[in-house]
């Protein structure tokens, strides 16, 4: 029967003796699995299989006087603890192959340590004061290649931790960590769920594969978003990209983030803001503000924005003035970039000089002004009834001789003879158009029956006109409900943005319409694309499909676009803001939400980047300045009130003095 010598050190396995209190020395019991064993017996006893037996009557212990290496146990390989600690033992009683979670130290002999736990934390002595040690928290390991010298314990190499992550830096030492040290990230391999600390620069070749980031000193592992790394800190002279996926050289100073292509600054250190591709110092708390009065105070007023932004009437900074509505990018009295109101009456957009570029519907550009169209037109090129370029809903446009403008009137009516319509079977934008002509050799061209001699363009192929319809249009024209249509004119341009050059089919349908097999299909309200009139496949902006509905529901008034529910906004409507990332509800600029404070009278805003504090209000109700705060810290409304009061006081004083001197003169 083979026995092996096992060595136990009072450590994390230590247990108070409960079963051998009369024979085992106090505090010399340990647990191996669920079994309590004694590692050092009272005088006259020796531990065999963890139990104290009479030393003189037991031949299994070759040396019962060991005192240099206390806590040794001889154990049979057929029972606990022997079969728990060792799988193979030599004839002289030395374990040669340790069980899982244990290792055989180098140069073990029958009178010294034969097997030790991978998680042993206390140095263990061999002959000649050689020492070895396990790794705290280690589950499986390999033995050191050679024993350490005195006072320098040689550590086992851990291959898997009981919990936490296995950390094995390049020098070959190993440890088990709850969190990986800086420069590493915790990776759980698909195979065996092995947890290891992997280098930020090296990544992991074990599944799931993770690509490392060169020159990264500190990283975060994003397991939920595709097993990717983001770098929080790069090596000297390098900075992470804005998305933190690379470390790059920077061309500028005071950069916090730099691009991988060219090294341009993408973000700045604290106390600096990005102006173009450079970081400039700024003490202002207003976002994207370069210069201000009363920096960081409650009455701070931005006086100049960074080069890519413009001052709003409320002294905030925005990149695009058009976001404020009827404003354009201009300059203020100090020649600083600022958003200016387009003051041309009935103008929709102004250029950078404040000149009108496009007029509102119902008006046309007349020099520098917007003049009214004829009341019958929706849009026009001039002011007469024959200058309409688009008609109101329910009215049809009849083009004049030049083919660019015409008159708006009632839609299709039926009649008899040449040029008359037999069936008004097509409706677009509320107006009816002809689908079958009364004369057999005529067909609807742009919705109107036209005789052969009156046609300026042969839109129907020869020999394809019969029974008042066209069965095959000339390539480049749209065949729709018995007629041929130009997609550059109404009503064709209402439903199709272009016909195929080699066919008479629609190349790009206008959202809300579909032309299939020469028939117009009108999608349900709010639907951009559909398979038929009642089955929507994609809703338009401002609408959403709810659950399994085949139609679209209008978004809440707080949403410009929404998804899944009417109040779940993707983009907020003007006058509203979101406090959460992604899709969520929008709150009025005037109201508070989740730590963000609204501003009464605010018409256009954004949440603060810090997610707390007041909204960034870009436009206020009332005056053109929007009640902006000026350098004194008073709103323009307050200043106006003070000015009026001052005028009244001065006028009263002058009147009093006049009366006084006149009366005194008479006296």
UniProtKB/Swiss-Prot annotation:
It is a single-pass type I membrane protein. Its main location: membrane. Belongs to the Giardia variant surface protein family. Keywords: Cell membrane, Glycoprotein, Membrane, Repeat, Signal, Transmembrane, Transmembrane helix. It is found in: Cell membrane. This is Major surface trophozoite antigen 11. Residues 18-633 are extracellular. It comes from the Eukaryota. InterPro entries: EGF-like_dom, Furin_repeat, Giardia_VSA, Giardia_VSP, Growth_fac_rcpt_cys_sf. GO terms for cellular component: plasma membrane. Contains 27 repeats of a CXXC motif. Residues 663-667 are cytoplasmic. Residues 1-17 form the signal peptide. It comes from Giardia intestinalis. Glycans are attached at residues 591, 630. The chain crosses the membrane at residues 634-662.
């Amino acid at each position: 029967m083979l026995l092996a010598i096992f060595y136990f050190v009072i450590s994390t396995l230590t247990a108070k003796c409960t079963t051998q209190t009369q024979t085992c020395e106090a505090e010399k019991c340990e647990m191996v699995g669920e079994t309590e064993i004694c590692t050092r017996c009272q005088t006259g006893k020796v531990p065999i299989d963890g139990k104290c037996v009479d030393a003189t009557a037991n031949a299994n212990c070759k040396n019962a006087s060991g005192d240099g290496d206390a806590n040794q146990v001889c154990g049979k390989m057929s029972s606990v603890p022997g079969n728990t600690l060792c799988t193979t033992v030599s004839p002289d009683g030395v374990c040669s192959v340790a069980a899982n979670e244990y290792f055989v130290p180098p140069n073990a002999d029958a009178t010294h340590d034969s097997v030790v736990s991978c998680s042993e934390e206390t140095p263990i002595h061999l002959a000649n004061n050689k020492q070895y040690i396990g790794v705290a928290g280690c589950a499986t390991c390999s033995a050191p290649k050679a024993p350490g010298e005195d006072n320098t314990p040689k550590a086992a190499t851990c291959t898997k931790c009981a919990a936490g992550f296995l950390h094995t830096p390049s020098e070959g030492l190993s440890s088990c960590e709850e969190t990986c040290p800086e420069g590493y990230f915790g990776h759980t391999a698909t195979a065996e769920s092995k947890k290891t600390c992997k280098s930020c620069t090296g990544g992991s070749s074990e599944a799931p594969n993770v690509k490392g980031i060169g020159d990264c000193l500190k990283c975060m592992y994003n397991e939920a978003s595709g097993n990717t790394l983001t770098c929080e800190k790069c090596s000297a002279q390098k900075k992470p990209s804005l998305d933190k996926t690379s470390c790059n050289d920077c061309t500028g100073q005071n950069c916090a983030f730099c691009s991988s292509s060219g090294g341009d600054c993408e973000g700045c250190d604290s106390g600096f803001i990005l102006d173009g591709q450079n970081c400039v110092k700024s003490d202002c708390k207003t976002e994207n503000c370069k210069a201000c009065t009363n920096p960081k105070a409650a009455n701070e007023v931005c006086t100049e924005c960074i080069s890519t932004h413009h001052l709003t009437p409320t002294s905030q900074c925005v990149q695009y003035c058009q976001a404020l509505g009827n404003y354009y990018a201009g300059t203020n009295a100090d020649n600083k970039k600022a958003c200016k109101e387009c003051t041309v009456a009935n103008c929709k957009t102004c250029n950078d000089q404040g000149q009108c570029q496009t007029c509102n519907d119902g008006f046309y550009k007349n020099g520098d002004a917007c003049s009214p169209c004829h009341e019958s037109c929706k849009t026009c090129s001039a002011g007469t009834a024959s200058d309409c370029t688009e008609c109101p809903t329910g009215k049809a446009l009849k083009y004049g001789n030049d083919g660019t403008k015409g008159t708006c009137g009632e839609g299709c009516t039926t009649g008899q003879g040449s040029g008359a319509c037999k069936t008004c079977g097509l409706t677009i934008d509320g107006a009816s158009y002809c689908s079958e002509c009364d004369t057999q050799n005529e067909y609807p061209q742009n919705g109107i029956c036209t005789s052969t001699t009156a046609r300026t363009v042969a839109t129907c192929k020869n020999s394809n006109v019969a029974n008042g319809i066209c069965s095959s249009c000339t390539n480049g024209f749209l065949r729709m409900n018995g007629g041929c249509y130009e997609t550059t004119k109404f009503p064709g341009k209402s439903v199709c943005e272009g016909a195929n050059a080699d066919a008479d089919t629609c190349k790009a349908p206008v959202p809300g319409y579909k032309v299939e097999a020469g028939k117009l299909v009108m999608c349900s309200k709010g639907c951009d694309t559909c398979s038929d009139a009642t089955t929507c496949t994609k809703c338009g902006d401002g609408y959403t499909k709810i659950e399994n509905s085949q139609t679209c529901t209008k978004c809440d008034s707080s949403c410009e676009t929404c998804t899944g529910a009417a109040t779940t906004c993707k983009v907020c409507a003007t006058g509203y803001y979101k406090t959460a990332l992604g899709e969520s509800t929008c709150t009025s600029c005037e109201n508070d939400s989740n730590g963000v404070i609204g501003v009464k009278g605010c018409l256009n805003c954004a949440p603060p980047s810090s997610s707390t504090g007041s909204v960034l209000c870009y436009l206020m109700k009332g005056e053109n300045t929007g009640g902006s705060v000026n350098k004194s810290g008073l709103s323009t409304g307050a200043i106006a009130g003070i000015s009026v009061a001052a005028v009244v006081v001065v006028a009263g004083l002058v009147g009093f003095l006049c009366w006084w001197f006149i009366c005194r003169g008479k006296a």
